[in-house]
Design a protein with these regions (language model features):
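Short, glycine/acidic-rich beta->alpha junctions
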Residues: 74, 205, 215, 225, ...
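Charged, structured surface patches that assemble and position nucleic-acid processing machinery
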Residues: 44-60, 76-92, 99, 103, ...
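Glycine- and charge-enriched low-complexity intrinsically disordered segments
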Residues: 114-167
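Acidic-basic catalytic patches of nuclease active cores, encompassing PD-(D/E)XK
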Residues: 2-8, 224-273
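Accessory beta->alpha helical hairpin/"wing" motif in late/C-terminal subdomains of nucleic-acid enzymes
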Residues: 90-105, 203-216
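Catalytic core segments in nucleotide and nucleic-acid processing enzymes
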Residues: 250-253, 257-258, 263-367
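Interdomain/boundary linker segments immediately adjacent to catalytic/signaling cores
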Residues: 157-246
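Long, contiguous, compositionally biased segments that the model treats as domain-scale units
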Residues: 1-95
């Protein structure tokens, strides 16, 4: 990915994307670098230059693509995954994902390149026409690389504004509301499908309400108060991040309650740890006459990154711990480490196919 010349050789694959250059073509580009450690991607704006280095040669062509030095190119190293995407407006999105990372696995899955060995270039034309991608997982990955995905339930906006008095309700209240709008989904149905349906509905309803409330605030304006604008922007981001995790816990708790599954949510264990769910309950956990083999601890994280290790220290009496997540295509390096640490990964069945075949046999479902 990195070269002193700052150029990629224009093999036939790139010509299929950018065509035959007449002179130097400067293409607006957004550069994005992703890894599993940083909470936000590194981004930069610039241009790619596509040209024929032998344009004046009567019989030979030598196409090249020049890329500038940016904060993204400075992080890229050999072995990283590179994705070059042409947008409908002609601009380009250049994504670099750290090699062997979970986010690289996710980007591979998103573009149908899980079996790509990294040699040369793989061209995927019109990937949006592929219908085998899971909406919830795809949206999360696309937003991570800076692509906004609109999802809305505009027909429900008036009802939400009336019910919640033009403000954001508590996460528990909103989760309950989202479930109530899905009359065709019953808690007795397949648990994996039920959880995904509830989460997808809540996500689309929340984005609909959020878009309206944010628009109202922007219309009101901030005057010359830059700090107020920054604070508002941060509050939007933080609300999105915290809400998804709480929504997942809310829907799981409702599923357990409706099915009569005994549990404690955020019960206190050693060192004031608060595992998301303890089965059959925190009282049994603290009763040392109760067989530890009958205890189960379940951590819940909408996304993992390195935070999955927090679950390991939340219940000393339980040797084999469980973690439920909605994160797709977690890398083999991460799942191998989870297995070694005696952490069982649990995902809705629909997300299992985002993983490699060798990983899928180990994954557990909700049902």
């Amino acid at each position: 990915l990195r070269s002193k010349q700052h150029e990629f050789n224009g093999v036939e694959s790139l010509k299929r994307v950018f065509g035959s250059a007449q002179g130097k073509q400067n293409v607006p580009a957004k550069f994005v670098y992703l890894n599993d450690i940083d909470s936000e991607p590194v981004t930069a704006d610039g241009f790619l230059t596509w040209y024929d280095a032998r344009e004046r040669h009567p019989t030979r062509s030598e196409y090249r693509m020049y890329f500038p030095t940016t904060s993204v190119s400075e992080k890229a190293v050999k072995g990283d995954l590179l994705v070059i995407g042409r947008r409908p407006d002609g601009s380009v999105l250049v994504v670099v994902a750290q090699g062997d990372s979970t986010v690289a696995s996710q980007v591979r899955w998103l573009f149908g390149a899980q079996n790509f060995d990294g040699t040369g270039y793989l061209i995927r034309e019109n990937p949006e026409t592929e219908q085998d991608r899971i909406a919830f997982a795809s949206r999360a990955i696309l937003e991570a690389i800076g692509v906004d995905v609109e999802t809305s339930q505009d027909a429900m906006l008036e009802d939400m504004l009336r019910r919640f008095h033009g403000a954001f309700p508590s996460t528990r209240e909103f989760s309950s509301y989202a479930r109530s709008t899905l009359t065709g989904v019953h808690h007795g149905d397949n648990g994996d499908g039920v959880l995904m349906a509830w989460m997808e509905r809540e996500e689309s309803l929340f984005r609909t309400l959020e878009r309206h409330l944010i628009a109202d605030r922007l219309v009101a304006g901030f005057g010359h108060d830059v700090d107020a604008f920054i604070a508002f922007s941060l509050s939007v981001q933080n609300r999105r991040k915290s809400r998804v995790g709480l929504a997942l816990e809310n829907h799981l708790e409702h599923l357990f309650l409706q099915r009569g599954v005994r549990h404690s949510r955020t019960g206190v264990t050693e060192n004031r740890s608060k595992p998301d769910f303890l089965f059959p309950g925190v009282q049994q956990y603290h009763d040392f006459a109760f067989d530890a083999k009958r205890l189960t601890v379940l951590g819940v994280k909408s996304t993992c990154k390195d935070r999955w290790r927090q679950v390991l220290a939340e219940a000393d009496r339980v040797e084999q711990k469980h973690l439920l997540t909605l994160e797709s295509a977690i890398s083999s390096n991460q799942t191998d480490e989870m297995r070694a640490k005696k952490l069982q990964l649990v995902l809705p069945a629909q997300l299992h196919r985002t993983f490699l075949p060798a990983q899928q046999a180990w994954l557990a479902t909700i049902e």
